[in-house]
């Protein structure tokens, strides 16, 4: 398996006010999977996504990516691993306002010895005619495409997306999700999306439902599931 999460636990607060955010989380993904972490606010999905990305330190358990146990890495090694293997897309685009589209995307290539062909990538993103524009000149969907390009330019093994369409309208959201599907198929990038949106599960081949910090349901072959399996 490409990604293995085993017996993962995470809590916040002191002993007296301890809140268990993730409890005994276990699952695995093969390379090229498109997985949704589905759950309401407070279910632990964003914390789990951040733990996989090395942004949250876990209390116990292990996270293994491509045979690297990232939960045991020192901070410097973890930072290097994150830069080399992982890409991040967030709800807010975090583009550099004084850089153009092409310059914002190039920022992601500076830390990789063999970045993706930027012209080809920008065309795949549908941004070629906007490549010399600044973020303030772009729509929300175009800004998110630019953020996706910045994450992809370094050829990440895993793309971690935290509510990537929550700030977008319905049509733009569908366009972004369609783009992520194309990226998954074309580049065989493993994609994990944390979301509360049931619609996004339609694009995934693995659905992991979280509720109160535990995996409530893990559906591994979405194409053959019964509709009732998507219910809580």
Feature names for model-found ranges:
Residues 159-162:
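Catalytic Walker B motif of ABC-type/P-loop ATPase nucleotide-binding domains
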Residues 134-144:
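Conserved ABC ATPase signature
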Residues 148:
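Hydrophobic anchor residue at the start of the ABC signature
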Residues 153-157:
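A short, proline-enriched helix->beta-strand linker immediately N-terminal to the Walker B motif
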Residues 70-87, 224-229:
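ABC ATPase NBD coupling module
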Residues 61-69:
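Conserved ABC transporter NBD signature motif
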Residues 53:
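Helix-to-loop junction immediately C-terminal to a conserved catalytic motif
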